[in-house]
A protein has these predicted regions:
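Extended acidic/polar, glycine-enriched regions
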Residues: 149-151, 220-307
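Beta-strand-rich structural segments
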Residues: 217-221, 652-656, 732, 738-754, ...
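Short flexible loop/turn segments that cap and initiate beta-strands
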Residues: 229-234, 275-280, 649-651, 657-659, ...
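Edge beta-strands of extracellular beta-sandwich domains
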Residues: 294-299, 707-719, 812-821
Length: 822
């Protein structure tokens, strides 16, 4: 975590005294005070004729309409998953007015951006004071000189232009399987700093003899006015409990570039690891005639070792990397993910048992890395050179700049163990020529720059076989059971790639699942899928049509199938002593422009959480293998109606890390079973039981050596078979205030529920009502496929009521009158 430490009491616009502390992450962002500028902004989506239009107010009658917004804010909070319209890519404007009260003599005033998409320009009044290209690295604009030209008694007018228009000469490519979002979707801050101040400190630690470690500190100044009087630098090191273990103080002259300013030893070092993420603090204070201030940087002491054709070691002990992936994307806000949601998401990762995350496919917000440090989650962070090929000089410079900024800004995070050079760079399409030699040469340039900036960490890429010898670590395409082959081929694919790749890691496995869709026979399609023909994603295998038989095209996209696939993958991973690790794709469903035909349109549904953070059943499969805290989960909490013949044995699975689980079916014990992690399915915790027509009650009791753990589910069992869907029903199932949840069901001519129906339905509303849609979830899209013959959506119902509807292109539209409860 990069954080300004010195707290200065500053009076801002409010009539209150508030303490401000700065997270430093930008290119030149250094200060002693920081005010986060989340409120007081207005937004306009579109272009203007000139900067004067931003400020002219009542001097014209045809002004554009401005909307009040709170930062972070994304252009595409709702339209990124609109089933009918592709998401907006173009210009947008933000404006605000800021009171300036810099407390430092000849101090500097900056605007700090944690990230803005994708190209940005900053204006103070009519003056363009700075520009930035790139949507993910942090950057700053020094507005000191511009302030002097504005009335000092008036609030400072600030406008920010953001543009996420398509541009093949920038990264990431629009061929990427995620949106290139626009807007001020990370925090913006007002920063004050003295005339000369610390711009950055980099901390290197190495484990020495015994339990000692050696720490080196390098520092860089922000000194735009070439201040040359003597300065004083003091450094204090504290352990994770706040105890001071080292102090120093030295007077010196200002320096240029980066300089080593301190070397010292830590005796009896406490090592950073997933089980004990101990963080030290380095507090650096710089004093000058202009004032004093400093930085507080956290760091960890740990060692990394990648064994050739073998496992990964952390602190000289083998650690199987149990990983996932994370996109900055959330229902209703897109890239403007609130801090509390980020915290909850990373906490949910840790509770699942994750010890590794690949941050796909770009530099992420400071809070994400801070949480990885605190929770003990190792990380792979990469630049967004993703698909499309290789552009010209400006394209290459942007790649180099983004890599330089990422490593410079996130250097001190002990969680980061890999720097990613790119992703799927074998994917052509943005340029007339796809030159593999040029891509190889540029990949080598990035690899060299990464090692020059940070010799302590390895480099890595995923899926570009013609470049696999360039980075230190390589991750090939292995999608056993989804894009290629069957999941039972997974271990053989791993073993082959471990043999063929000196330093191997497996990033991306899994598949899509439509939340709430379950199946009694999820593998009935497997007879079509050939074995022995490879497990890689080839060509356009991500599309739902064309090519050879595969689960992504011929499967049912049920949670049931994905549970089987994940269960098998995890069983195999745990048995391989030479495996470095693997990371499933992905933790949460996310928006993508490439998949309009998915069950939830424009959503990549490979997450173990829905886009709003709701867990799917597969979350608990991972937890049963990885979590240390005792857990027990009967599969089927979101499966309200199962089906089959009378007296037909049905499979019940419990996912648990308890040593023994006993299952009760309608009050009668079906027996206790011991957990065996090498057994499949569910580590041996599975039973074939007979269910009765109507309501069934399952209860499982897990034994842990302490208090027992209990899980229960209630569901219906239907023995009647059904024909094709004939009609839809629509009913209100719950109400909270003025928000009504409605549920559609498909029935055949005889009135029997069609429990495997997967037709596309469309919800609508007229009158004084509003669909709570464009969320990209199984209950938050107006267009989606049925899951087990049903679908839900919420409707906000106003005074006078509304008329809800559900339709299918082959079935008659059904209506439901809704009344406001007030």
């Amino acid at each position: 975590m990069s954080r300004f430490f010195i707290v200065t009491w500053v009076r801002f616009r409010l009539n209150a005294i508030i303490p401000i502390a700065l997270f430093i992450s930008g290119t030149i962002c250094v200060a002693q005070t920081r005010q986060t500028l989340d409120s007081g902004w207005e937004f306009y989506q579109g272009s203007v004729g000139s900067i004067w239009e931003i400020w002219r107010g009542d001097k014209a009658t045809d002004n554009v309409t401005w909307t009040p917004v709170i930062l972070p804010h994304c252009f595409n909070g709702r339209d990124s998953v609109d089933p009918d319209v592709r998401y907006y890519q173009g210009p947008g404007w933000y404006r605000t007015k800021i009171s300036i009260k810099n407390p430092y003599t000849e101090g500097r005033t900056l605007l700090h951006f944690d990230g803005a998409g994708q190209k940005s320009r900053v204006f103070v009044g009519m003056k363009n004071v700075g520009e930035h290209n790139g949507g993910y690295d942090q950057w700053d604009v020094d507005i000191t000189d511009a302030i002097s030209k504005v009335d000092s008694q008036a609030a400072l007018p600030v406008a920010v232009f953001c543009d996420n228009s398509r541009d093949s000469e920038s990264i990431p490519s629009d061929l990427s399987d995620f949106n290139r979002y626009g807007g001020l979707y990370r925090h913006v801050s007002l920063v004050y700093c003295p005339q000369v101040s610390l711009q950055r400190i980099h901390i290197e630690s190495a484990i020495g003899e015994g339990s000692n470690s050696i720490v080196k500190i390098r520092a860089r100044l922000y000194n735009p006015t070439s201040y040359r009087d003597d300065i004083e630098l003091s450094i204090k090191i504290q352990d994770g409990y706040g105890k001071t273990i080292h102090e120093s103080n030295q007077k010196m002259s200002p320096w240029d570039d980066e300089k080593e300013v301190e070397v010292f030893n830590i005796t009896d070092s406490k090592l950073w690891s997933p089980t004990s993420p101990h963080l030290y603090s380095c507090i650096a204070i710089l004093k000058s005639k202009s004032g004093e201030g400093g930085l507080k940087e956290r760091f960890g002491v740990r060692s990394l070792e990648w064994i050739e054709h073998g496992p990964f070691k952390l602190n000289a002990e083998r650690l199987l990397l149990r990983g996932t992936h994370y996109h900055e994307d959330h229902a209703g806000v897109a890239a403007a993910v609130p801090d509390e949601v980020v915290r909850q998401t990373l906490k949910s990762m840790k509770e699942m048992g994750v010890n590794f995350v690949r941050l796909g496919h770009y530099q992420q917000a400071p809070l994400v890395l801070d949480l990885c440090d605190e929770l003990g989650i190792l990380a792979w962070e990469e630049i967004p050179w993703c698909r499309g090929g290789l552009g010209g000089d400006s394209y290459k410079q942007l790649c180099r700049d983004m890599q330089r900024n990422m490593i410079d800004q996130h250097f001190n995070h002990p969680s980061i163990i890999l720097w990613g050079l790119g992703n799927e760079n074998d994917w052509p399409g943005d340029f007339e020529t796809f030159d593999k030699t040029a891509i190889r040469n540029f990949m080598g340039i990035l690899n060299t720059q990464a090692h020059q900036l940070d010799p302590s960490r390895k480099t890595v890429i995923r899926r570009c076989d013609f470049c696999k010898d360039i980075p230190d670590i390589y991750s090939p395409s292995i999608w056993a059971g989804w894009y290629g082959g069957r999941y039972i081929e997974y271990k053989a694919a791993l073993e082959k790639n471990i043999r063929d790749t000196p330093f191997f890691f497996h990033a991306e496995y899994g598949g899509d699942s439509h939340a709430r869709r379950h199946s009694e026979d999820p593998e009935k399609f497997l007879g079509k899928v050939a074995t022995g023909e490879g497990t890689a994603e080839v060509g356009k295998a991500y599309k739902a049509d064309g090519g050879k038989a595969r689960a992504s095209k011929d499967g049912d996209w049920s949670e049931s199938y994905m549970i089987n696939l994940f269960d098998w993958h995890l069983k195999e991973q745990e048995s391989m002593t030479n495996l470095t690790g693997a990371a499933m794709w992905i933790f949460k469903d996310f928006a993508t422009p490439l998949r309009p035909e998915n069950p939830v349109p424009r959503v990549n549904q490979k997450g173990v959480l829905e886009r709003d953070g709701t867990p799917k059943e597969s979350y608990y499969v991972f937890q049963s293998y990885w979590a240390e805290k005792p857990m027990l989960h009967i599969y089927g909490h979101t499966w309200p109606v199962r089906w089959g013949k009378s007296d037909e044995p049905k499979l019940v699975k419990c996912f648990s890390n308890c040593r023994e689980v006993e299952l009760f079916v309608n009050g009668v014990s079906a027996g206790a079973k011991l957990r065996d992690i090498a057994a499949y399915p569910a580590s041996g915790l599975n039973w074939m039981v007979k269910l009765k027509e109507g309501t069934n009650f399952l209860r499982a009791i897990g034994k842990t050596g302490g208090a027992p753990i209990i899980d229960e589910i209630v569901f219906q069992y239907q023995t009647a078979s059904w024909d094709k869907p004939d009609h839809l029903t629509l009913n209100e199932i719950s109400r909270e205030g003025d928000v009504v949840t409605v549920e559609a069901h498909a029935f055949d001519k005889a009135g029997t529920a069609c429990l495997d129906a997967s037709e596309v339905v469309r919800f609508g509303v007229t009158g004084n009502g509003r669909l709570l849609d464009n969320l990209g979830t199984s209950t938050g899209s107006r267009v989606l496929q049925l899951y087990n013959g049903c679908a839900r959506i919420r409707i906000q119902c106003g005074h006078g009521g509304a008329m809800a509807s559900v339709s299918n292109e082959k079935l008659e539209t059904t209506f439901l009158k809704l009344q406001n409860s007030k």
